[in-house]
């Protein structure tokens, strides 16, 4: 008790002396260094909370009182970073911060330790490390800037600092809320540091002397201004991205709001991004927040907006900030109080500039005169330039696009539509945050609404702003990403090197490693020197009596004495080693244990296995002694004892967890004889997945080093090739393939593989497959696993010996169905390993055995799945198909190698196959096996394939199969673009006779690509000239197409002869009234040119069918179109409404007819030229189609095959039918009357309005292509206004 009280008095005196005497030695005459030593010793022994108090005293002494001692005691204090106490580890982090602030050169030694503490398992330690890095990053950057000559150690140190900063940014995704909060504050400080301080930047008092980007010289030899600026902007993006995360917590969101406000005030160049982030948050509050948390977030958002509003740089964003504050329920009076005064905005730049100049004078070493000249433009100019660089954001562009569209009618419609999706009861969260809308309908409120909607659309990746930004930033992004990656890679490598130097051994690999503090050494155990045993005291002489010596011992005593003697010899290992008699001891033990029973052997074995590496000599001595005893016995000797010794050693080694040094292999290879039982132990060792490689390496060594029994060892390895464990089997196959390369082993391995392969011919798997330890009935059926057991070795050898493929074909023909299916599943990879140029594989294809057709086909598919077939393979398959096996399925794998004529001849047979097979055929022909639309290797381009399907004779193939095949083509939208389909329809229309499926294809093409409407109208008009009514099925489709494209098809219907026009009305009487209304909308001058026979049919009722003149039997001439063209000629234009330009004069009828004929000829000529220039069928006339638009899902889906031979059905709803107008003149009044109300047909597309408003020059023959292209493009906002008027 006295001593303990004395210790406490001593400790109290040291502590009190520290606080009372700042100068001079202590009361006991101790120097400061001695006091530090004493305190450190106390800290090492204390385990309670007072350890922190003692360590803080040490810190005060060596940092504040006598900094010269800092380097001396640095290692001793840093050693406490491994302390179990969390508070002690946090103290070490704080000590590192204070030490580096006192002497920045210490950062070279301490940064690696701080890096380790940043990865501590305790959350509080990590948070303390993040706080320390917030300060040390600025200190380290300032240190690097001041150093004009950078050493390798400084580079490595800065690389690790930068890497740690990147890791802390990644901690924004941590699972812990506290860590994320500290990471947010670190990112805030990083952004302020890595961005230039402007004239109007707010500078907190504590940060007046902190470094920022504007203080870094642009010509610094190591620190690159532009790289740091890019990292700062990237940190801003990370923080903004984190804040809008939908699962962000309330505390993180509150912290992020405050950080963004600080960034906006201190770095006004980011004001725009901050305001936009606040708008996004206001419109998209995280759904995970509770009601109280929502209120808290909104309150914080209001406070931060008010603080930002006070800043002079917020003048440009006052409208947005004010609107947000009003939405958050802020009174106008409070907003007015926080408005920045003009006086402040005038005064502040001057004050800040002066303060900046003062700071530059206080720190002249940061840059030289010539460096300051680079920064002459001043902070204010940089601020404006940086503000202009950013330009409009995605939200701004989308908001400007939406604002003119927010008319009262449109807003009312949006409200009505959204009413359907509203919940029946008002959510409590909405009720809590709802504030009445003030000044509704004003321009400011509309602008705010547009920004709210733009924010939602931008967050969803929609709107013109997102699209424009993507297009503008694609190329710059690619250029900017390259350099930072190289920098980051460099830093990662250097950080890894430092980490290794910290945790590695004490060997000095580089100067940097010497300076990094090493981990404390663990004390090595002191081995006590064994004392020699003293002889018993027997000083008194005794009379020798024989009876005393010859007392008999019991058997137990004898055994105990022998066992004791052996144990003493075993324990004397170290003492004998010192005396130099180790080999004698080993011989004695080996001789003794060979003569003793199993009990003694177990003791020696246990002793050996305790430290196999050190006692391996004893094991081998024992093993060879047992073998010598067997040899000495001659013919009467047995191997039992030797075998027991070897098995015990191998089994004991097998139970050892760590065998990386190959002791097992050494015992096996140096054993004089490997018995059957020992071989079984080796086999079990190989079956251990963790030791399979080592065990099989041992077997391989036995095979090569013991040739007398190499086939016995090889057989064990071959048995393992069909093992049920994948890892064991794969290792065995790997070693066997190496053995197969040896000539002396090749025949045995091959024979073994073929024997296993021949087992597949048996009706049931033989018992050899199940192993000796498994009791399985011989009559068990084949399973996939047992089949694979017979194939593993064979398939592994097949790529090395291609001749084996013929054996597989022979077995395949005799195997049962289940075996065949398994063979087909596993043959793919080995066949690919052989390659399509293998002579043996080509021979198999040429001499395909009967019954192996499926196998050969599977091989062909595996070879040609990803690469085109070789000419030699195509030749063999062609010969096989034409000469021996006329099964069209053989041609499928080599379709891309056949001639176009051969593919067309085989099409009728191919499309009658199973639907899955037909799909594979089309995938190969269209090049879409792997999701790509590339038919460059196909003998048929997509257009030729579709035309060939239309030309298939219905006698050779039923129409239902042809329709299904065409549907497969239409399902490939990436291949069958609008250009391809236009060329297909053009060529089909020019055929004679017309294909039966022509109109079905036209309707499907129009459904897929509504922009083909104008081209389809031309097709219909030319079909009239070819007397389409002579082809009943095509005529039926013609009428269907006209019915679905009304009112645009009215111009085509009016070109029909009277009799055919009457037939149209018979089948579709609903067309009569709209067509009659269309004609009556013509001017009197135009109606005068309508033939009376046509008008009679139009005006006739169902009861009166007038007699009409029979249509001419020959093909229609161009003169026959004259009456209709005259009817459609423009009449004198009525007095137009006041407009910028008068309407053009009407064109004479003769000019109109000439125009019509010129259009037809120009269109045909252009189609022919396009077809010649692009023989692959990819292109199409520019006058017909333009870029393919996005199509609704209903139109995108593949066509549904019809049940009847001809059924003209659209693939989507009828409202998707395009309403495309073909104008024949310039009369605007005619255009308006032709654009009928499209409510029955779906919304009027923009193409109609575009064509309707096109000019006379655009419709001239030479400008036909340009006019149609412009009609197919999306209409501009100016064109949208007359369209809306026409619809209304």
From Swiss-Prot:
<dbReference type="GO" id="GO:0005886">
    <property type="term" value="C:plasma membrane"/>
</dbReference>
<feature type="compositionally biased region" description="Pro residues">
    <location>
        <begin position="1131"/>
        <end position="1149"/>
    </location>
</feature>
<dbReference type="Pfam" id="PF12295">
    <property type="entry name" value="Symplekin_C"/>
</dbReference>
<feature type="compositionally biased region" description="Basic and acidic residues">
    <location>
        <begin position="349"/>
        <end position="362"/>
    </location>
</feature>
<keyword id="KW-0597">Phosphoprotein</keyword>
<feature type="cross-link" description="Glycyl lysine isopeptide (Lys-Gly) (interchain with G-Cter in SUMO1)">
    <location>
        <position position="1256"/>
    </location>
</feature>
<dbReference type="InterPro" id="IPR032460">
    <property type="entry name" value="Symplekin/Pta1_N"/>
</dbReference>
<dbReference type="GO" id="GO:0005829">
    <property type="term" value="C:cytosol"/>
</dbReference>
<feature type="repeat" description="HEAT 5">
    <location>
        <begin position="227"/>
        <end position="266"/>
    </location>
</feature>
<feature type="modified residue" description="Phosphoserine">
    <location>
        <position position="494"/>
    </location>
</feature>
<feature type="modified residue" description="Phosphoserine">
    <location>
        <position position="1276"/>
    </location>
</feature>
<feature type="region of interest" description="Disordered">
    <location>
        <begin position="1163"/>
        <end position="1288"/>
    </location>
</feature>
<keyword id="KW-0796">Tight junction</keyword>
<keyword id="KW-0130">Cell adhesion</keyword>
<dbReference type="GO" id="GO:0006397">
    <property type="term" value="P:mRNA processing"/>
</dbReference>
<feature type="cross-link" description="Glycyl lysine isopeptide (Lys-Gly) (interchain with G-Cter in SUMO1); alternate">
    <location>
        <position position="361"/>
    </location>
</feature>
<feature type="region of interest" description="Disordered">
    <location>
        <begin position="1130"/>
        <end position="1151"/>
    </location>
</feature>
<feature type="repeat" description="HEAT 4">
    <location>
        <begin position="153"/>
        <end position="192"/>
    </location>
</feature>
<feature type="repeat" description="HEAT 3">
    <location>
        <begin position="104"/>
        <end position="146"/>
    </location>
</feature>
<dbReference type="Pfam" id="PF11935">
    <property type="entry name" value="SYMPK_PTA1_N"/>
</dbReference>
<comment type="subunit">
    <text>Found in a heat-sensitive complex at least composed of several cleavage and polyadenylation specific and cleavage stimulation factors. Interacts with CPSF2, CPSF3 and CSTF2. Interacts (via N-terminus) with HSF1; this interaction is direct and occurs upon heat shock. Interacts with SSU72.</text>
</comment>
<comment type="function">
    <text>Scaffold protein that functions as a component of a multimolecular complex involved in histone mRNA 3'-end processing. Specific component of the tight junction (TJ) plaque, but might not be an exclusively junctional component. May have a house-keeping rule. Is involved in pre-mRNA polyadenylation. Enhances SSU72 phosphatase activity.</text>
</comment>
<feature type="modified residue" description="Phosphoserine">
    <location>
        <position position="1260"/>
    </location>
</feature>
<feature type="modified residue" description="Phosphothreonine">
    <location>
        <position position="1274"/>
    </location>
</feature>
<keyword id="KW-0507">mRNA processing</keyword>
<keyword id="KW-0677">Repeat</keyword>
<dbReference type="GO" id="GO:0005856">
    <property type="term" value="C:cytoskeleton"/>
</dbReference>
<dbReference type="GO" id="GO:0097165">
    <property type="term" value="C:nuclear stress granule"/>
</dbReference>
<keyword id="KW-0963">Cytoplasm</keyword>
<keyword id="KW-0832">Ubl conjugation</keyword>
<dbReference type="InterPro" id="IPR016024">
    <property type="entry name" value="ARM-type_fold"/>
</dbReference>
<dbReference type="GO" id="GO:0016604">
    <property type="term" value="C:nuclear body"/>
</dbReference>
<dbReference type="InterPro" id="IPR011989">
    <property type="entry name" value="ARM-like"/>
</dbReference>
<dbReference type="InterPro" id="IPR022075">
    <property type="entry name" value="Symplekin_C"/>
</dbReference>
<feature type="region of interest" description="Interaction with HSF1">
    <location>
        <begin position="1"/>
        <end position="124"/>
    </location>
</feature>
<feature type="compositionally biased region" description="Basic and acidic residues">
    <location>
        <begin position="1163"/>
        <end position="1173"/>
    </location>
</feature>
<dbReference type="InterPro" id="IPR021850">
    <property type="entry name" value="Symplekin/Pta1"/>
</dbReference>
<comment type="similarity">
    <text>Belongs to the Symplekin family.</text>
</comment>
<keyword id="KW-1003">Cell membrane</keyword>
<feature type="modified residue" description="Phosphoserine">
    <location>
        <position position="1238"/>
    </location>
</feature>
<feature type="compositionally biased region" description="Polar residues">
    <location>
        <begin position="380"/>
        <end position="392"/>
    </location>
</feature>
<feature type="repeat" description="HEAT 1">
    <location>
        <begin position="31"/>
        <end position="64"/>
    </location>
</feature>
């Amino acid at each position: 008790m006295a001593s303990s009280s004395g210790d406490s008095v001593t400790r109290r005196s040291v502590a009190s002396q520290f606080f009372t005497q700042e100068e001079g030695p202590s009361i006991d005459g101790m120097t400061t260094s001695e006091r530090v030593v004493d305190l450190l010793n106390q800290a090492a022994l204390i385990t309670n909370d007072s350890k922190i108090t003692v360590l803080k005293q040490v810190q005060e002494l060596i940092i504040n009182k006598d900094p010269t001692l800092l380097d001396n005691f640095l290692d001793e204090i840093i050693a406490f970073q491994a302390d179990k106490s969390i508070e002690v580890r946090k103290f070490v982090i704080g000590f590192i911060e204070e030490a580096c602030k006192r002497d920045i050169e210490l950062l070279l030694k301490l940064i690696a330790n701080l890096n380790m503490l940043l990865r501590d398992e305790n959350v509080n330690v990590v948070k303390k490390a993040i706080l320390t890095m917030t300060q040390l990053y600025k200190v380290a950057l300032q240190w690097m800037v001041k150093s004009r000559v950078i050493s390798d150690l400084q580079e490595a140190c800065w690389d690790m600092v930068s890497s740690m900063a990147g890791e802390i940014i990644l901690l924004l995704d941590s699972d812990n809320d506290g860590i994320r909060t500290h990471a947010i504050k670190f990112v805030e400080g990083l952004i302020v540091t890595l961005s230039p301080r402007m004239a109007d930047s707010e500078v907190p008092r504590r940060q007046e002397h902190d470094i920022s980007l504007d203080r870094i010289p642009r010509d610094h030899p190591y620190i690159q201004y532009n790289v740091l600026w890019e990292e700062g902007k990237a940190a801003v993006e990370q923080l903004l991205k984190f804040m809008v995360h939908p699962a962000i917590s309330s505390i993180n969101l509150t912290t992020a709001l405050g950080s963004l406000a600080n960034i906006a005030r201190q770095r006004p160049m980011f004001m725009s991004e901050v305001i936009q982030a606040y708008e996004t948050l206001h419109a998209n509050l995280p759904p995970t927040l509770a009601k109280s948390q929502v209120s808290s977030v909104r309150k914080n958002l209001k406070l931060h907006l008010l603080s930002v509003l006070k800043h002079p740089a917020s003048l440009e964003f006052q409208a947005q900030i004010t609107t947000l504050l009003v939405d958050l329920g802020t009174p106008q009076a409070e907003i007015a109080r926080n408005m920045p005064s003009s006086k402040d905005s005038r005064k502040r730049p001057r004050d800040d500039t002066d303060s900046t100049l003062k700071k530059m004078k206080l720190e002249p070493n940061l840059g030289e005169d010539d460096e300051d000249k680079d920064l002459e433009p001043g902070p204010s100019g940089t601020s404006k330039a940086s503000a202009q660089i950013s330009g409009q954001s995605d939200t701004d562009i989308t908001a400007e696009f939406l604002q003119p569209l927010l008319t009262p009618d449109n807003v009312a419609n949006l409200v009505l539509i959204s009413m359907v999706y509203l919940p029946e009861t008002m959510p409590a969260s909405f009720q809590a945050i709802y504030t009445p809308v003030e000044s509704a309908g004003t321009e400011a409120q509309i602008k705010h609404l547009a920004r709210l909607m733009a924010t939602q659309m931008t967050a969803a990746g929609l709107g013109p702003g997102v699209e424009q930004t993507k297009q503008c930033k694609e190329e710059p992004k690619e250029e900017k990403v390259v350099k930072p990656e190289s920098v980051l890679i460099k830093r990662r490598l250097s950080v890894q090197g430092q980490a290794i130097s910290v945790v590695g051994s004490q060997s000095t690999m580089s100067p940097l490693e010497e300076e990094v503090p090493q981990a404390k050494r663990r004390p090595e155990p002191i081995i006590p020197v064994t004392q020699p045993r003293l002889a018993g005291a027997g000083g008194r002489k005794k009379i020798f009596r024989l009876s005393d010596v010859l007392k008999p011992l019991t058997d137990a005593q004898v055994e105990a004495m022998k066992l004791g003697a052996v144990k003493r010899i075993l324990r004397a290992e170290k003492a004998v080693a010192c005396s130099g008699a180790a080999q004698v001891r080993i011989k004695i033990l080996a001789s003794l244990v060979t003569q003793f029973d199993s009990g003694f052997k177990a003791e020696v074995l246990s002793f050996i296995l305790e430290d196999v590496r050190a006692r391996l000599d004893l094991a081998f001595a024992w093993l060879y002694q047992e073998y010598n005893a067997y040899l000495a016995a001659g013919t009467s000797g047995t191997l039992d004892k030797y075998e027991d010794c070897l098995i015990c050693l191998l089994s004991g080694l097998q139970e050892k967890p760590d065998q990386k040094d190959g002791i097992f292999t050494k015992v096996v290879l140096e054993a004089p004889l490997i018995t059957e039982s020992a071989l079984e132990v080796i086999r079990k060792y190989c079956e251990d997945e963790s030791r399979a490689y080592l065990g099989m390496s041992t077997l391989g060594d036995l095979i090569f080093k013991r040739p007398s029994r190499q086939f016995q060892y090889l057989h064990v390895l071959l048995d393992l090739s069909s093992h049920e464990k994948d890892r064991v089997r794969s290792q065995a196959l790997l070693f066997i393939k190496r053995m197969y390369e040896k000539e002396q082993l090749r025949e045995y391995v091959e024979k073994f593989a073929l024997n296993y392969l021949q087992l597949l011919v048996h009706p049931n798997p033989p018992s050899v497959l199940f192993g000796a330890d498994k009791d399985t009935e011989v009559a068990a059926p084949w399973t996939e696993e047992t089949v694979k057991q017979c194939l593993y070795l064979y398939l592994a050898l097949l790529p090395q010996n291609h001749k084996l493929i013929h054996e597989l074909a022979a077995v395949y023909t005799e195997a049962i169905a289940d075996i065949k299916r398994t063979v087909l599943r596993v043959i793919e990879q080995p066949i690919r390993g052989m390659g399509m140029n293998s002579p043996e594989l080509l021979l198999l294809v040429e001499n395909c055995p009967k019954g192996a057709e499926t196998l050969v086909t599977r091989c062909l598919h595996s070879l040609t799945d990803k690469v085109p077939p070789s000419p030699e393979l195509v030749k063999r398959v062609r010969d096989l198909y034409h000469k021996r096996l006329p099964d069209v399925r053989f041609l499928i794998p080599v379709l891309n190698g056949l001639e176009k004529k051969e593919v067309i001849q085989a099409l009728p047979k191919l499309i009658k196959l199973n639907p899955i097979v037909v799909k594979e055929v089309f995938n190969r022909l269209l090049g879409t096996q792997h999701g790509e639309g590339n038919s460059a290797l196909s003998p048929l381009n997509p257009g030729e394939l579709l035309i060939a399907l239309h030309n298939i004779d219905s006698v050779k193939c039923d129409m239902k199969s042809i329709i299904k095949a065409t549907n497969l083509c239409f399902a490939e939208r990436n291949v069958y673009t609008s250009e391809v389909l236009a060329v297909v329809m053009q060529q089909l229309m020019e055929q004679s006779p017309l294909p039966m499926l022509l109109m079905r294809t036209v309707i499907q093409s129009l459904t897929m690509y509504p922009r083909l409407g104008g081209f389809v109208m031309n097709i219909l008009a030319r079909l009239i000239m070819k007397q389409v009514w002579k082809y009943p099925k095509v005529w039926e489709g013609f009428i269907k197409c006209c019915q679905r494209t009304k009112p645009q098809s009215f111009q085509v219907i009016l070109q029909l002869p009277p009799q055919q026009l009457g037939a149209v009305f018979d089948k579709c009487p609903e067309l009569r009234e709209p067509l009659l209304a269309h004609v009556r909308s013509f001017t009197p001058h135009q109606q005068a040119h309508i033939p009376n026979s046509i008008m009679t049919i139009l005006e006739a009722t169902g009861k009166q069918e007038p007699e009409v003149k029979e249509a001419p039997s020959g093909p229609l001439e161009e003169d026959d179109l004259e009456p209709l063209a005259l009817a459609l000629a423009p009449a004198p234009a009525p007095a137009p409404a006041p407009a910028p330009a008068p309407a053009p004069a009407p064109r004479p009828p003769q000019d109109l007819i000439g125009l019509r004929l010129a259009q037809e000829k120009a269109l045909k000529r252009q189609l022919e030229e396009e077809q010649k220039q692009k023989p692959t069928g990819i292109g199409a006339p520019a006058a017909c189609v333009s870029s393919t638009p996005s199509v609704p899902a209903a139109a995108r889906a593949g066509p549904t095959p019809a049940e009847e031979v001809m059924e003209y059905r659209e693939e989507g709803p009828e409202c998707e039918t395009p309403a495309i107008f073909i104008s024949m003149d310039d009369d605007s009044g005619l255009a308006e009357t032709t654009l009928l109300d499209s409510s029955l047909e779906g919304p009027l597309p923009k193409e109609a309005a575009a064509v309707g408003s096109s000019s006379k020059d655009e419709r001239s023959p030479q400008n036909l292509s340009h006019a149609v292209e412009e009609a197919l493009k999306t209409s501009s906002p100016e064109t949208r206004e007359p369209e809306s008027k026409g619809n209304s």
